[in-house]
Amino acid sequence: MGCGIAAVQDDFVNGGRYMKRFIYLITLILVADGAQGNMYSELQYVYDTNPVIGQGRADLDAARAGVDASKTELQPYLGITGNVGMARTTALGYDFDYAPMQYGLEFQQNVFQGGAMFAQVRGAQLQYDAVRANLRAIEQDVLMSAINAYIEVLNARAVMDLNRNNERVLGEYYAFVRDAADVGKSTQTDVAQASARLEMARYGTVDAVAQYENAIEVFRRIYGNVPAEFVDIDLARVADLFPESVRDATEYALRNHPVLRALDAQEVAARENIKIAYKSMLPSIDVRGAVQQVDNVPFLNDITDSRIGVYLRVPLYDRGNAFANADRVRANIAGIHEQIINARRVVVENLNAAWNIYQSQEYAINATLASVDANKAALDGVRDGQAHGRRTVLDVLNAEQELLNSRVAHTRAKHARIAAFFAVLASMGDLTPENLGLVAD
């Protein structure tokens, strides 16, 4: 269980899996059999069946059992005792052989142990809180990866459709130029230029199809099944979660990010462990009692022994174990404190990175949309100019390429903005199953 928490925290403070995947997705977007698929309904399946989340839930169950186990020393002990054997007693010159039998009931209740027992319970409860926060971090990591996979499918599909349309348009234009050359209205150079662009368009389509199929395979690995159709993501469902400013987001993240909450709980739990470390040197008070019956003893029949008492134990020397254990715990606390400092910096870094990408893609969407409109107008003008002999075939081909580039850039900017939107929520620690409308199985 502890190893699981450490693994997630180490991964987070070294950059975070979800942030690396997010940056990778943005790079892909900017550079390069089922029912209709609604992302939120598809995420429900991931939330229910993902093995990493399942392991986190198992760790939480183990931590809950640890809390119960920590309370056992607060409970009384009650047990049955008994023994039977052979004995010989010599008295007045006679030997007496007999088989004494002893049985009874005993109990013990610890009343005080220097506060170590209560510290043990509090430490277990805090450890449970840490594991629960760690599970929240795991859930958000997995859900962010799943969302990125869904967005990449949408982006790859849109780019594929644009390339297919471009191939169709250039194919028609190539046929037009070739026919014009047959009647002497264009040159073989024009035909060669149109043919070259058509071949590049075909390559662009093949590459876009490959990127789409790769995105589908990533989706299949994460989600299990691939829907027949992917529906665009409805951000209105989670729009209210988005912060007003990066300052508000940072303040919220530093209070609520699950990795920070897990580390905070671990630090407090470790401080409780100092009291536990001194357990072997702390005084203890027990209440003990017993009722015993002894039979088969010569001259003594039906012996009943009842006793109850308070037992005080004050250790004087334990070979230095308590102090060594306490020093080890203090060193562990210092290490956790350094992890908290680093984790806080990582939270702020990841949040600012996601926020900056979101803001830049807001601008990119508007800029690329304006570029699309301008390139459409430019293409119409170039085509008209060619019809009147003022523009060449190469001018038209270049205008077609500019229009395709701006359309692809606009598509990628839209999907990069959606990815950044969810990355901001994840960096805040707010990409929870509840906020996404998911229900625990």
Question: What feature does the model see in each segment?
Answer:
Residues F12, Q36, A409-D441:
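Acidic, low-complexity, intrinsically disordered peripheral segments
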Residues G54, Y77-Y98, Q108-A137, R261, ...:
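Small/polar (Gly/Ser/Thr/Ala-rich) solvent-exposed segments
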Residues G2-Y18:
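Short, Lys/Arg-enriched N-terminal segments with co-localized hydrophobic residues
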Residues P100-Q102, A116, N148, Q193, ...:
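Transmembrane beta-barrel architecture of outer-membrane proteins
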Residues F22-V31:
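Sec-dependent N-terminal signal peptides
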Residues Q55-S70, I138, V142-N163, E172-Y174, ...:
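Amphipathic alpha-helical coiled-coil segments
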Residues N14-R17, I138-Y252, A354-I357, Q361, ...:
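Periplasmic alpha-helical coiled-coil/stalk elements that build and connect Gram-negative outer-membrane
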Residues G34-G79, V111, T187, V226-V268, ...:
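Bacterial Sec-pathway N-terminal export signals of envelope proteins
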